[in-house]
From Swiss-Prot:
Assigned EC number: 2.1.2.10
Organism of this sequence: Xanthomonas oryzae pv. oryzae (strain KACC10331 / KXO85)
Protein name, entry field: Aminomethyltransferase
Disulfide partners: none
Function in brief: The glycine cleavage system catalyzes the degradation of glycine.
MF (Gene Ontology): aminomethyltransferase activity; transaminase activity
Biological processes per GO annotation: glycine decarboxylation via glycine cleavage system
Length: 369
C-alpha cells in the first residue's frame, strides 16, 4: 500500500503531480521541474522529505556501536549537534546505505537514513545493536522539510523564536541544533542538504508540519518536487542509493573513499575488504561524465572505455549547464576515450571531476573550456 506524508493533501492543493517513489506518494513537480530547479539555485525552494527515516540510538555504548557499524569514524564527532556523512557496510564491503549521523550526547546519536532502504536498515541496525545493548527507536512521529538555496537560511531564521536566531545564524555546516519557531514548534535544525546549495533540513513533529510549511510559503519560499531534487543533487555530485551504489558496490567503487576512516585500532564491518581495495586498487571506479552532443544520458546505457565496458548510473540533462551529465561506473584504468551507446550509436563523452556545479556555477573543465 502506498504511504503518504503528512503534507500529501497540501501538495495536491498546490497542484503537485504525484508519483510513486519507493512506495511513497510524493510530488515530482508543482508545474515546472525546470523552474523549481532554478528557484533553488537562485533563491530558495523547499522539499517534503518526510519519507526519510529518522532513527534515534540510545545507550551507554552507543559510540562504540557506531564505531563498529559505520565506515566513517564517529570519533570525529566531539561537539553536540555535529554531523557526519558515512556509509554503513556489509561484511563484503558493500554499501547497505549512506546516511547522516548526528552526535546528540554521549548516550544518544541520531541517524537519518534513506526511505527506500528503511526495512533492511532497521533490521541490520537492530541486529548489530544487540551486542552493544543499544536501544533503536524509529521516529515515525517526525516529518522533515528541506529548505535549500542562497536565501534559504535567511527565510527559515525569520520564522524562529527571536531568542534562537543568533545561534541558528552561527550554525556551521554539517551541524544541528534544537530550536523552536515563533509559534513554539519544536525544530531540529540541521545545516545539511541534498542540492549543493546552503540551507537547512528541519525535523519537526508531524502535527506541526503543515503549519510550518505554510509559514515558509508565506515567506516566499516556493515548493519543489523530487524531479528538481534529482537534477540538483546530480549537478552537486551527490549519490542516489540504489542507482549509484548498493550492497554489491564498495565505497571505493563509488568515489566515496573520502567517507572511509581507516583509523588505527578501530575494526568496523567491511573494513578488511576496504583495506584490500585500498592496497590493491578497486576493480571499478565511479566517474563524472559530460556529453557535448545533444541528447540525454540515462541509467543503464553502456559506456565503452579502453579498459572495458561500464554503464551510466545516474544521468540527466543539467538545467544549469545546458548539457547532459551523469555518473558512470567503468573498469579501473584509462578514462581518456569514453563513448556511450545511445540507440545503437556511439557518442563521445568527457570525463570530468565532480561536483559539476558549485554555488550555482559550472566547475572548471565541466563545460570543456
Amino acid at each position: 500500500m502506498t504511504q503518504k506524508t503528512i503534507l500529501n493533501d497540501t501538495h495536491r492543493a498546490l497542484g503537485a503531480k504525484m508519483v510513486d517513489f519507493g512506495g511513497w506518494d510524493m510530488p515530482i513537480h508543482y508545474g515546472s521541474q525546470l523552474d523549481e530547479h532554478h528557484q533553488v539555485r537562485r533563491d530558495a525552494g523547499m522539499f517534503d522529505v518526510s519519507h526519510m527515516t529518522v532513527v534515534d540510538l540510545h545507550g551507554a555504548r552507543v559510540r562504540a556501536f557506531l564505531r563498529d557499524l559505520l565506515a566513517n569514524s564517529v570519533d570525529k564527532l566531539k561537539v553536540c549537534g555535529k554531523a557526519l556523512y558515512t556509509c554503513m557496510l556489509n561484511p563484503q564491503g558493500g554499501v547497505i546505505d549512506d546516511l547522516i549521523v548526528y552526535y546528540m550526547s554521549e548516550d544518544f546519536f541520531r541517524l537519518v537514513v534513506n526511505a527506500a532502504t528503511r526495512e533492511k536498515d532497521l533490521q541490520w541496525i537492530g541486529e548489530q545493536a544487540v551486542r552493544f545493548d543499544v536501544r533503536v527507536e524509529e521516529r515515525s512521529d517526525f516529518a522533515m522539510i528541506a529548505v535549500q538555496g542562497p536565501n534559504a537560511r535567511a527565510n527559515v531564521i525569520d520564522l524562529l523564536d527571536p531568542a534562537d536566531t543568533a545561534a541558528a545564524s552561527k550554525l556551521g555546516r554539517f551541524a544541528a541544533l534544537q530550536t523552536r519557531s515563533r509559534d513554539g514548534i519544536e525544530l531540529f535544525l540541521a545545516r545539511t542538504g541534498y542540492t549543493g546549495e546552503d540551507g537547512f533540513e528541519i525535523v519537526l513533529p508531524q502535527e506541526a508540519a503543515v503549519a510550518f510549511w505554510n509559514a515558509l510559503l508565506a515567506q516566499g519560499v516556493k515548493p519543489a518536487g523530487l524531479g528538481a531534487r534529482d537534477t540538483l543533487r546530480l549537478e552537486a555530485g551527490m549519490h542516489l542509493y540504489g542507482q549509484d551504489m548498493d550492497d554489491a558496490v564498495t565505497p571505493y567503487e563509488a568515489a566515496l573513499a573520502w567517507t572511509i576512516a581507516l583509523d588505527e585500532g578501530r575494526d568496523f564491518i567491511g573494513r578488511r575488504v576496504l583495506e584490500s581495495q585500498k592496497a590493491q586498487g578497486a576493480p571499478r571506479q565511479l566517474i563524472g561524465v559530460v556529453m557535448d552532443d545533444k541528447g540525454v544520458l540515462r541509467h543503464g546505457q553502456a559506456v565503452f572505455t579502453a579498459s572495458g565496458e561500464g554503464e551510466i548510473l545516474s544521468g540527466t540533462f543539467s538545467p544549469t549547464l545546458g548539457k547532459a551529465i551523469a555518473f558512470a561506473r567503468v573498469p579501473a584504468g584509462s578514462i581518456d576515450q569514453l563513448r556511450v551507446d545511445i540507440r545503437g550509436k556511439q557518442v563521445p563523452l568527457r570525463a570530468v571531476k565532480f561536483p559539476f556545479v558549485r554555488d550555482g556555477q559550472a566547475q572548471p573543465g565541466v563545460l570543456g573550456d
